[in-house]
Amino acid sequence: MEEEEKNPSSIYIVADLLEDIFLRLPLKSILISKSVSKRWRSILESKTFVERRMSLQKKRKILAAYNCKCGWEPRLLPGSSQCKGNEEIVYLHCNAAQPSFTCDGLVCILEPRWIDVLNPWTRQLRRYGFGFGTIFGVGSAFSPRHWAMGFGKDKVTGSYKVVKMCLISFSEICARDPEVEYSVLDVETGEWRMLSPPPYKVFEVRKSECANGSIYWLHKPTERAWTILALDLHKEELHNISVPDMSVTQETFQIVNLEDRLAIANTYTKTEWKLEIWSMDTEVETWTKTYSIDLENRVASRERRNRWFTPVSVSKQGNIVFYDNHKRLFKYYPRKNEILYLSADTCVISPFFENLAPLPQKSTLHTPIIAGEPNAPLTTLVVVGSIWSPLFLFSVKL
């Protein structure tokens, strides 16, 4: 009351109304608002506000790598590129050769000696050590025989997690049996925990995908059969999922997150040239064929036998954007049964949308053990962006 008498022009706005105002502001103004007061920051970083803001987005963009080996930290480049089909591409300045994963607009990049988690929208970058185990130098650190990584979100708690399955062969540790490590990093706390291994051996796996609170890997337990290895990020339990019967090869068989559902994309290249997409019902883990796209006479087929396609996103009208392993981007219109060529030399990372979820205030980087090098401590990196400009024309009581 005394404060209101001293400043009669001030206005007190209840939290619900203030949140509604923030929802209508552009991104730059929201980032500025975080520095105004603790109360505003608390509202803008709340789980409710972050989820409401994401749900209001009308259209997702496409995130592509602007490949650069300069060694600077990854960051989102200003502006965007508009291509055919009314698709918008934003570029992440990074080394495209490094393995990366995305979840809800956050990006996880595996560097040879640490893990970066980046929120491109808030310009926050957090760096973590690899936790348990040994890093075997730059040349072998990302060999599929050694590492199976994943990044996703616990749909119950909302926390983001990095998962590591480390498969070390006999020749590298001189042991009788291979040493297998299963561990999970909580991005919020920066702590690694060991997971219970599955009741079966995990051999060859492919790059992971996250969807609906789980991380999935294509797993080949035998020479002929493929299955999907699933990790529930809340229960932190592993189990197998069967795949639909189809003719597959290691190259053409892909798993993707398509509108927060796990999907399989399989490119047929022999008797017929087509792209089939199957989507999984998460509750009962059954599959439904959602697309069968005829590629014959629609896409240049000079490299047909060594070419496969990966879907990126599906619009509300059912139009699907996909790309091939030669960095060419396409869009399929089911109603017209047409394929539109969008762009070339586009290194697609994932669909992309705004996420204002805050990352922890500090990075946690433990000293990794590197073969042939002393255990020198590594520095902790925290990058937080800020923009300054006027926001409101009236005084607000905080």
UniProtKB/Swiss-Prot annotation:
Annotated F-box domain residues: 8-55
UniProt xrefs under Pfam families: F-box, FBA_3
Signal sequence range: none
Highest rank taxon of the organism: Eukaryota
InterPro entries found in the cross-reference section: F-box-assoc_dom_typ3, F-box-assoc_interact_dom, F-box-like_dom_sf, F-box_dom, Kelch-typ_b-propeller, SCF_F-box_component
SUPFAM superfamilies (UniProt xref): F-box domain (SSF81383), Kelch motif (SSF117281)
Annotated protein name in UniProt: Putative F-box protein At4g17780
Organism name: Arabidopsis thaliana
Lineage of the species this protein comes from: Eukaryota, Viridiplantae, Streptophyta, Embryophyta, Tracheophyta
